[in-house]
């Protein structure tokens, strides 16, 4: 078993320690005797109530989820907050770096730039991909070609901005977080979620 698998099993064990009825109430989860259900970035997932394993819907079938970032984000979302009632999102958006002391968080620029280049010249396609994933187009902010509120988890959204490139400026992506986001997720998990969201947009874009 490699380190990733060990951490996934640690996440399962943590999830299984929680009162699932309280999680159902807290997050408004659909459920039955065997599974809890939630949507993550436009895809339906279910969590086995007995062993904590996570599966995702593929048509009429359910498939074991082996994406480490997806699995750990779902576990963290359900298990991060010790509050019985979560604070409502404020609509006050900020960069992820605002949550930590200056200089203490790793830069995501090279990672995000990879997706910005892939989206270059495809404003309409990126728009349709965001809509396919449940995104709501918002008023343009700071001159961005696209501004979307993306519902990524139950009652939890992030704000995506995209500026297309031209002869003078390269394309740019900026992801903004509600100021109470760390009541829902640990700081490190925001990086997993960011990657999962941009990957999902790119995959949707390819199929448009």
What are the roles of these predicted feature ranges?
Residues 1-34, 40, 70, 77-134:
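Short Lys/Arg-enriched alpha/beta "domain-start" segment
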Residues 23-50, 139-164:
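Amphipathic, interaction-prone secondary-structure segments
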Residues 44-69, 163-188:
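Intrinsically disordered, low-complexity regulatory segments enriched in Ser/Thr/Pro
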Residues 74, 78, 194-197:
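Short amphipathic C-terminal alpha-helix that caps PH/PH-like domains
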Residues 121-183:
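Conserved binding-pocket/active-site segment within a compact domain
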Residues 183-200:
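Helix-rich interaction surfaces within compact, conserved domain-sized segments
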Residues 206-208:
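Conserved small/polar residues in nucleotide/adenosyl-binding loops
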């Amino acid at each position: 078993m490699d380190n990733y698998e060990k951490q996934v099993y640690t996440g399962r064990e943590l999830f299984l320690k929680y009162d699932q009825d309280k999680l159902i109430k807290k997050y408004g989860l659909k459920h039955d005797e065997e599974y809890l259900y939630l949507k993550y970035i436009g895809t339906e997932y279910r969590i086995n109530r007995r062993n904590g394993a996570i599966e995702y819907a593929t048509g009429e079938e359910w498939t074991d989820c082996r994406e480490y970032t997806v699995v750990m984000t779902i576990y963290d979302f359900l298990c991060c907050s010790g509050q019985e009632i979560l604070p409502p999102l404020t609509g006050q958006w900020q960069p992820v770096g605002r949550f930590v002391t200056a200089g203490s968080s790793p830069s995501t620029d090279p990672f995000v730039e990879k997706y910005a280049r892939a989206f270059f010249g495809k404003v309409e396609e990126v728009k349709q991909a965001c809509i396919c994933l449940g995104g709501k187009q918002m008023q343009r902010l700071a001159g961005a070609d696209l501004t979307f509120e993306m519902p990524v988890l139950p009652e939890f959204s992030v704000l995506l901005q995209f500026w297309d490139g031209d002869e003078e400026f390269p394309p740019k992506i900026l992801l903004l977080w509600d100021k109470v986001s760390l009541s829902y997720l640990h700081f490190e998990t925001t990086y997993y979620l960011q990657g999962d969201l941009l990957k999902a947009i790119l995959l949707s874009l390819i199929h448009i």
